[in-house]
Regions:
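Hydrophobic/proline-rich hinge and linker segments of small-molecule sensing/allosteric domains
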Residues: 49-72, 163-166
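Periplasmic-binding protein-like
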Residues: 55-59, 145-179, 201-207
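A ligand-binding cleft/hinge motif common to bilobed small-molecule-binding domains
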Residues: 24, 37-45, 97, 127-150, ...
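Extracytoplasmic small-molecule ligand-binding "clamshell" domains
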Residues: 1-41, 45, 110-111, 197, ...
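Short amphipathic alpha-helical coupling segments at ligand-binding clamshell hinges
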Residues: 75, 79, 132, 170-181, ...
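Ligand-binding cleft/hinge of the Venus flytrap
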Residues: 1-9, 51, 77, 88-111, ...
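Flexible hinge/capping segments at coil-to-helix
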Residues: 63-83, 172-173
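Short helices/loops that flank or line small-molecule/ion binding pockets
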Residues: 20-32, 74, 114-135, 142
Length: 208
């Protein structure tokens, strides 16, 4: 965000907030910008999608002793425990359809923050979780016990995630200025350096 606001000549104030609350604050105009937001028609009603941040790959990670049971998403129902998911996160259309099934919902354990979801894995409250692939790889580096216990079994969704601006809180003129500013820095050495730091990619084919 600082790369964007510096280019746009704006001042950035970072506000910490759980993901579901951040979406609500963006919709009401109480915060102006968010990072790493997947596109949905519902979100487009209250958020202007300024430009792609990076390509995200959502994966299902499962306890290795149960990994052989999972061949498709609905096989979660074969597990003797829960799968952790981030509340209000978007993991692709297939997941949206499946999670609407009451029989499937009982296997999902919701977290309000990434930290809560990480703790579910560390404390073995869940048998797996849906994660951003780069996030899971980073957690494996930081916490070797996770790498020993969990493995990626399915890729659920590959799609760009965006920087967005509140339609309620940010004027149309400023939203356009921000969009133009992001276009100037997108793919620049500074942008690529940020992506490399977190293991992210601009190219969808890189995540295949």
């Amino acid at each position: 965000l600082r790369l964007l606001t510096n280019e746009a000549g704006c001042t950035l104030e970072v506000v910490g907030s759980p993901w579901p609350r951040s979406l609500n604050l963006l919709e009401s105009g109480d915060i102006d910008l968010m990072l790493t937001v997947s596109y949905t028609e519902e979100r487009n009603q209250f958020a202007e999608f300024l430009g792609v941040h990076y390509m995200e790959e959502s994966v299902l990670v499962i306890d290795k002793q149960y990994a052989s049971r999972i061949r498709k998403l609905t096989d979660i129902g074969l597990l003797p425990g829960f799968v952790g998911v981030l509340r209000d996160a978007y993991y692709g259309e297939e997941f949206e359809q499946v999670k609407a099934d009451p029989d499937f919902q009982q296997y999902l354990l919701y977290a309000n923050t990434l930290t809560q979801k990480l703790n579910m894995l560390k404390r073995q409250r869940v048998l797996g979780s849906v994660e951003d692939k780069t996030q899971f790889i980073e957690w494996n580096r930081q916490y070797p016990e996770l790498a020993q216990r969990y493995q990626i079994v399915l890729t659920l969704h590959r799609a760009p995630v965006y920087i967005v601006a509140s339609r309620q809180g940010v004027s149309k003129e400023l939203r356009q200025h921000l969009k133009n500013s992001w276009a100037k820095v997108y793919g620049s050495p500074e942008h690529l350096a940020i992506l490399a730091e977190f293991g992210w990619s601009l190219d969808e084919s890189d995540t295949a």
